[in-house]
UniProtKB/Swiss-Prot annotation:
Motif (NPA 2): 197-199
Xref: SUPFAM superfamilies: Aquaporin-like (SSF81338)
This protein's name: Aquaporin TIP2-2
Subcellular location as annotated: Vacuole membrane
Matches recorded under InterPro entries: Aquaporin-like (IPR023271), Aquaporin_transptr (IPR034294), MIP (IPR000425), MIP_CS (IPR022357)
Gene name of the encoded protein: TIP2-2
Record GO cellular component, one term: membrane
Keyword Iron-sulfur: no
Protein family: Belongs to the MIP/aquaporin (TC 1.A.8) family. TIP (TC 1.A.8.10) subfamily.
Gene Ontology biological-process annotations: water transport
Annotated Gene3D superfamilies: Glycerol uptake facilitator protein
GO molecular function: water channel activity
């Protein structure tokens, strides 16, 4: 059952909430800077060569490590979402209000965009790689890929961070979240690009002024994140969690 709560303007503009938005902006900026930067670095080291297995592994590891750090540094302030699909999945389960979640989205998208604009500046205007489905993969297939891998990501967030029964498992949440993202990039990278994160795809699109196919990385991740929130919230949390009221974020 969907547990969306709209929330109040007062709560969404409280000092605590504003600190959370700043934390999301900074953490998303750091994550995207390292993730996209690793792809640019691969191109620099290979003189623009095609992505090979070693390059894919390196980029996946860079994303996993950067997300681990990003979630860790923001967790105590904002919950460490760094991803509109994660925020949406948590909103579906009643862990963050819709209004506060929208401001999380703004912070995440701004952080990703600033990261990519900074990369463009510090690399002397090098092309910013954007997400896109590979040749032989249709956009519909890309959407399905993104649904599945984002479901895995948000399900992991629920199991390790949002579930009130998590206990000591919560201490490894950033590691588990980073690992699943790295693994999913290895699995889906050659096909859909392995985004799982609308902000991660939006930032490069802004810097490159190229939004071709960007819808894939909104539709797929939001469906996957929402489904994970529904499934985990109803099946494994059920009535043991009170719907968000005064609490604004996970």
């Amino acid at each position: 059952m969907v547990k969306l709560a709209f929330g109040s303007v007062g709560d969404s503009f409280s000092v605590t909430s504003i600190k959370a938005y700043v934390a999301e902006f900074i953490a998303t900026l750091l994550f995207v800077f390292a993730g996209v930067g690793s792809a640019i670095a691969f191109g620099q080291l290979t003189n623009g060569g095609a992505l090979d297995p070693a390059g894919l592994v390196a980029i996946a590891v860079a994303h996993a490590l950067a997300l681990f750090v990003g979630v860790s540094v923001a967790a105590n302030t904002s919950g460490g979402h760094l991803n509109p699909a994660v925020t949406f999945g948590l909103a579906v389960g009643g862990h963050i209000t819709v209004l506060t979640g929208l401001f999380y989205w703004v912070a995440q998208l701004l952080g990703a965009s600033v990261a990519c604009l900074l990369l463009r500046f510090v690399t002397h205007g090098k092309a910013i790689p954007t997400h896109g489905v590979s040749g032989g993969t249709t956009e519909l297939e890309g959407v399905v890929f993104e649904i599945v891998i984002t479901f895995a990501l948000v399900y992991t967030v629920y199991a390790t961070a949002a579930d009130p029964k998590k206990g000591s498992l919560g201490t490894i949440a950033p590691i588990a979240i980073g690992f699943i993202v790295g693994a999913n990039i290895l699995a889906a990278g050659p096909f859909s690009g392995g985004s799982m994160n609308p902000a991660r795809s939006f930032g490069p699109a802004v810097a490159a002024a190229d939004f071709a196919g960007n819808w894939v990385y909104w539709v797929g991740p939001l469906i996957g994140g929402g489904l994970a929130g529904l499934v985990y919230g109803d099946v494994f949390i059920g009535g043991s969690y009170q719907q968000v009221a005064d609490q604004d974020y996970a």
